[in-house]
A protein has these predicted regions:
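PP2C/PPM-type serine/threonine phosphatase catalytic domain
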Residues: 1-364
């Protein structure tokens, strides 16, 4: 990825009102409708980050965040061209994602309305103005009531939506030329949030899988390969972190394969450039799985599952929290489990005495 060398976007050059251009013009809007649904939805999320080996920048230049309360996720990729000026673009990306998470959290606490990812991006950009560098960014938010995924993207990060092991939707990227993406930054040639492309995927349904990633993912793996990973993975499970790890490691393997035909190689050939194999880069993957929630608490049985993780040096600690709404009564159960890898099956039913029973099976 190289830094853009374009006229400034903040009034020092011409203002572009056409879609997708640098400056104050608003980016294009894309809308995709999938299938009808009736339940309120929510996301459970997990991530995997594999920075490329660099002793000077062990944290890499990617960053991401997950805000479960706001049902919002995002990724950013600092533009590596800044290294020639002695600037760590990873600092800009990390600051941008940190401010984005704070903004999303603040919106959720002050309003019950769905989070607007464009507002999150704009405020994060403004709050990150004191940091030198530039970065791509892609932020997604779920409107639980409408069952709609709303996203904004600047640059060559992006996301895909999978249903029944098939890719239903893939976002487009923003590039001025090969390997020269749009990028947020306060530098000459930097873009502002208004240039972001906007996406809306309507009528998601339970079981849909959203895969969000930086160019380190998208340059090294095709949608069909992610489909293969999802098929091989036990899709009935809800460990999004594990699925993200599988996808990221598949992309890493491809990036190191000099003989693999990669998306990056194909784009290079279209641009008249010579490149063979994958592209070594930081790889960030965020996986979100769509689940159904029950709108009416007066239904006989309602269950909510959340998994809290604390990653230690050798093992992971899991705490399962089950909440039941049985008629007007409410009960909560905490079931700790120290298994490094957890599999669970959970079922509850109501018998003639109006009692709920629960079963939990854990296996290492």
């Amino acid at each position: 990825m190289i830094a853009a060398n374009k006229p400034p976007a903040f009034g020092l050059g011409p203002i572009h009102n056409c879609y997708g251009c640098c400056g104050y013009g608003r980016g294009p809007y894309h809308k995709k409708k999938l299938n009808s649904r009736t339940d309120q939805l929510h996301l459970i999320c997990g991530s995997c980050y594999l920075p490329k080996e660099n002793k000077e920048k062990p944290l890499g230049e990617d960053a991401h965040f997950i805000c479960h309360d706001a049902q919002t996720i995002g990724v950013a990729d600092g533009v590596g061209g800044w290294a020639r000026k002695g600037v760590d673009a990873g600092e800009y990306a990390r600051g941008l994602m940190n401010h984005a998470k704070k903004t999303a959290t603040g919106i959720t606490r002050s309003s019950a309305a769905a989070v607007d990812p464009r507002k999150v991006l704009s405020e994060a950009y403004a709050n990150n103005a004191g940091v030198q560098g530039s970065s791509t960014a892609c932020i997604l938010s779920l409107d639980k009531e409408r069952g709609t995924l709303h996203a904004v993207n600047v640059g060559d990060s992006g996301f895909m939506v999978f249903r029944d092991n098939m890719c239903f939707f893939k976002s487009s990227t923003q590039q001025r030329s090969f390997n020269c993406p749009y990028q947020l930054g306060n530098c000459v040639g930097g873009d502002c949030p208004e240039a972001a492309e906007e996406f809306e995927v309507e009528e998601l349904r339970p079981g849909d899988i959203i895969v969000l990633g930086t160019d380190g993912l998208l340059d090294n793996i095709f949608a069909s390969e992610i489909e293969e990973v999802i098929v091989a993975y036990d899709v009935s499970g809800q460990d999004c972190e594990e699925l993200a790890s599988y996808i990221a490691n598949r992309a890493l393997y491809n990036s190191l394969d000099k003989y693999n035909v990669s998306p990056f190689q194909m784009e290079a050939q279209k641009a008249g450039r010579e490149h063979v194999g994958g592209k070594i880069d930081d790889i960030t993957v965020v996986v979100a799985r769509v689940l159904a929630s029950t709108k009416n608490k007066n239904k006989n049985i309602y269950k909510k599952l959340s998994i809290e993780r604390n990653t230690g040096t050798t093992t992971r600690a899991y705490s399962l929290k089950f909440q039941f709404h049985i008629g007007e009564r409410h009960k909560a159960f905490d079931v700790p489990c120290q298994n490094a890898f957890l599999r669970y099956t959970f079922s509850c039913f109501r018998n003639s005495a109006n009692l709920a029973k629960r079963f939990l099976e854990c296996a290492t």
